[in-house]
């Protein structure tokens, strides 16, 4: 998914920079596993031969974690088993329906399985992502998070192959420190997860709304931006109601990698406004204060409503738009914005001005109104999900794109610009953090941003269960003890296209 981190060494046909295709940062060895025993053999072989070890599920990672020059990759994509338990008794006290998912089960497959059983499974927005890989291990936000919390909150039991080759079950009471670490502490840390058993909820009637407006749909630029600002003013009410919104904000050129500072062909697109357990009239009533403001500003927009007696049907009808993978034309950074940013008028205004500034400078926003706590359930306290998620009302991704033929210098400067720009949101949320799965490879103090107060214990457990550092991934727990000796012109200190070596003191 992120060829930039492999050194642009083997691009898809039509996007290659030269006529050659070299190994670059792609693993040298790949084991297409279908059994736990094969994973154990692979882990033991890599450890005994001192090979760099990589874990890959579907490869959906913005920062190149499924790659590594000269490494051995364990590919878990074929672990597709699914088992339904009508009544599952978990160590933590949960009693109810549950589903066991093999590590290779993708979101679409989990959703389809749940639909057949008339239950709801918490998965991600993108249907092709693996449920039991880095998505859930990094926390995992969902269109249903504002109601039920993070994907990691749903896990009742894990099966894991540890760095020493042992195959264990981890629950809140059995191997509880492994359970705690893996649920929020990220993937590629101390073991290979082979399956997860997760909660299954009743089917949930859901309404979904989409709409957009462009600069041409408003009387002037002031009205365009006032319309967006009024959305931010309603975040608290939307999240408190258990809804989720995914929006795009930027110029048409920004989506094509052709944006320039000062371009004013702006558009706002509500990709998905998800209202679980709400009818269309109830959703319309919730949106009315915002829509009244848009109408008073003479903004032209047409909301399209869809409703079904289960979440899956509306999401499959209009879910995350699929994007072209395998291209190195983007760089992103993100920030979780806590509730106080929206309660405080000054902070809310600074948030608005920051996002406007990003768009004015040729960047684009992929943002969410979302809660990582969940309005219908209490989040567990025995897992390592980034604490900032529990107080967040928004997850904001700021990104840039460039033409795929851009020079290394352009890529480098564009990347640093996004990292530096994110200071505007860091400053209004100094005690918050960023979602590791959609975060900046160059995030300053990634330990605090991605893991928060959990990091000291996470690092301690890393030394306990993987003292030799067999498992490594960019920005993962303990990765500061290692460095990649890069061989390509991109002067990142973090890059997969090079030999992995212990960091000199």
Model-derived regions: residue spans:
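Soluble FAD-dependent oxygen oxidases
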Residues: 1-505
């Amino acid at each position: 998914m992120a060829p930039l981190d492999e050194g642009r060494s083997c691009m898809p046909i039509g996007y290659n920079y030269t006529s050659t295709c070299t190994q670059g940062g792609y693993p040298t060895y790949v084991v297409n596993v279908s059994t736990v025993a094969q994973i154990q053999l692979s882990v033991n072989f890599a450890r005994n031969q001192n090979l760099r070890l990589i874990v890959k599920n579907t490869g959906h990672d913005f920062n190149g974690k499924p790659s590594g020059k000269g490494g051995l990759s364990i590919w878990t994509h074929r672990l597709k088993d699914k088992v339904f338990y009508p009544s599952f008794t978990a160590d933590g006290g949960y009693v109810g329906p549950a589903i066991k998912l093999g590590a290779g089960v993708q979101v679409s497959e989990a959703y389809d399985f749940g639909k057949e059983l008339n239950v709801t499974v918490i998965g991600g927005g993108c249907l092709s992502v693996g449920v039991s890989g880095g998505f859930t291990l990094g926390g995992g936000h969902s269109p249903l998070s504002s109601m039920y919390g993070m994907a990691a909150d749903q896990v009742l039991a894990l099966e894991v192959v540890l760095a020493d080759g042992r195959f264990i079950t981890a629950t809140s009471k059995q191997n509880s420190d492994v359970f705690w670490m893996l649920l929020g502490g990220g993937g590629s840390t101390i073991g290979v997860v082979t399956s997860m058993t997760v909660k299954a909820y009743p089917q949930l009637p859901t309404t979904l709304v989409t709409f957009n407006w462009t600069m041409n749909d408003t009387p002037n630029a002031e009205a365009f931006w006032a319309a967006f600002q009024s959305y931010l003013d309603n975040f608290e009410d939307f999240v408190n109601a258990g809804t989720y919104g995914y929006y795009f904000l930027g110029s048409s050129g920004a989506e094509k990698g052709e944006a320039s500072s000062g371009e004013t062909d702006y558009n706002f697109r509500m990709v998905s406004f998800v209202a679980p357990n709400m009818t269309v009239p109830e959703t319309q009533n919730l949106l009315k204060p915002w829509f009244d403001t848009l109408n008073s500003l003479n903004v032209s927009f047409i909301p399209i409503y869809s409703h079904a007696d289960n979440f899956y049907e509306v999401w499959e009808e209009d879910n995350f738009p699929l994007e072209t993978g395998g291209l190195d034309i983007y760089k992103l950074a993100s920030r979780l914005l806590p509730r106080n940013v929206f309660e405080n008028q000054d902070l809310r205004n600074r948030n608005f001005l920051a996002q406007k500034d990003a768009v004015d400078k040729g960047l684009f926003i992929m943002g969410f109104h979302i809660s990582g706590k969940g309005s219908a359930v209490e989040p567990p306290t025995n897992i390592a999900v980034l604490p900032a998620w529990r107080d967040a009302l928004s997850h904001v991704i700021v990104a840039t794109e460039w033409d795929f033929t851009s020079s290394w210098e352009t890529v480098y400067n564009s990347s640093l610009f996004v990292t530096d720009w994110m200071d505007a949101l860091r400053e209004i949320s100094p005690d918050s953090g960023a979602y590791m799965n959609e975060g900046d490879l160059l995030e300053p103090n990634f330990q605090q941003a991605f893991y928060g107060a959990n990091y000291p214990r996470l690092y301690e457990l890393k030394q306990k269960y993987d003292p030799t550092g067999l498992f490594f991934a960019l920005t993962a727990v303990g990765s500061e003890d290692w460095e990649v000796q890069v061989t390509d012109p991109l002067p990142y200190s973090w890059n997969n296209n090079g030999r992995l070596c212990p960091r000199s003191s």
